């Protein structure tokens, strides 16, 4: 299954949670989910009982859409997490957090992961001083992520950094806002990653 490219606000309403897909609109309380917190369609406001499989599928979809990965990429990451020692669900979230597009978002250089992915693919991001245009590039502890010199005055990047004064920056990156670079200091602990995903259902789904 390819990466989702449809209306993101309709997707959030269908899943019933904010997936951080609309950035500033969500912060301002102007997203479709804020205005209509129920599923789209004629029967969207009806309450329906969801099956165990439905729960498992919903949590997988939430994680996939939030991080902007395809089914193939997601399954590959899950398989890697399952091979490692430790909590498979927590390891999966850690691997997703290491994606370059996600790290760019976490450092506050983009208001959404989708925009962060565009910055990466269009050559606006450097890793350790070299251009990397692969969103799935795995960032490791100690690596320097920087906005390219030509892009440091990009108004969307400047605005995203300004918004971090309101949203804050996660604890596992150190960011020099004025110089527009940051260091990925470590892989976060699961409890540090605040996302509306219950990964145990994902583990159950793929373990069948």
Swiss-Prot record:
GO CC list: small ribosomal subunit
InterPro entries: Ribosomal_uS4 (IPR022801), Ribosomal_uS4_bac-type (IPR005709), Ribosomal_uS4_CS (IPR018079), Ribosomal_uS4_N (IPR001912), S4_RNA-bd (IPR002942), S4_RNA-bd_sf (IPR036986)
Top-level taxonomic group: Bacteria
Entry keyword set: Ribonucleoprotein, Ribosomal protein, RNA-binding, rRNA-binding
Any GO molecular function: rRNA binding
SUPFAM superfamilies in UniProt: Alpha-L RNA-binding motif (SSF55174)
GO BP, sorted A to Z: ribosomal small subunit biogenesis; translation
Function recorded in the entry: One of the primary rRNA binding proteins, it binds directly to 16S rRNA where it nucleates assembly of the body of the 30S subunit.
Family, as annotated: Belongs to the universal ribosomal protein uS4 family.
Entry-linked HAMAP family: Ribosomal_uS4_B
Quaternary structure (record): Part of the 30S ribosomal subunit. Contacts protein S5. The interaction surface between S4 and S5 is involved in control of translational fidelity.
Name under which the protein is recorded: Small ribosomal subunit protein uS4
Species annotation: Campylobacter fetus subsp. fetus (strain 82-40)
Lineage start: Bacteria, Pseudomonadati, Campylobacterota, Epsilonproteobacteria, Campylobacterales
Underlying gene: rpsD
């Amino acid at each position: 299954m390819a990466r989702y490219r449809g209306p993101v606000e309709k997707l959030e309403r269908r899943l019933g949670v904010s997936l951080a897909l609309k950035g500033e609109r969500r912060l301002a309380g102007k997203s479709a989910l804020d205005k209509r917190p129920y599923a789209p369609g004629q029967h969207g406001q009806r309450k329906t009982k969801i099956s165990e499989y439905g729960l498992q599928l919903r949590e997988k979809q939430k994680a996939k859409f939030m991080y902007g990965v395809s089914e193939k990429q997601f399954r590959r990451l899950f398989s890697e997490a399952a091979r490692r020692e430790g909590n498979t669900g927590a390891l999966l979230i850690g691997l997703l957090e290491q994606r370059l597009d996600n790290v760019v978002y976490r450092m506050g250089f983009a208001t959404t992961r989708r925009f962060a992915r565009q910055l990466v693919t269009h050559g606006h991001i450097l890793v350790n001083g070299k251009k990397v245009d692969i969103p799935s590039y795995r960032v490791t502890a100690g690596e320097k992520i920087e906005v390219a010199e030509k892009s440091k005055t990009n108004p969307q990047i400047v605005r995203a950094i300004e918004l971090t004064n309101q949203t804050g920056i996660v604890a596992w990156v150190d960011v020099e806002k004025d110089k527009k670079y940051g260091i990925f200091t470590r892989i976060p602990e699961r409890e540090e990653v605040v996302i509306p995903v219950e990964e145990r259902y994902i583990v159950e789904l793929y373990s069948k």
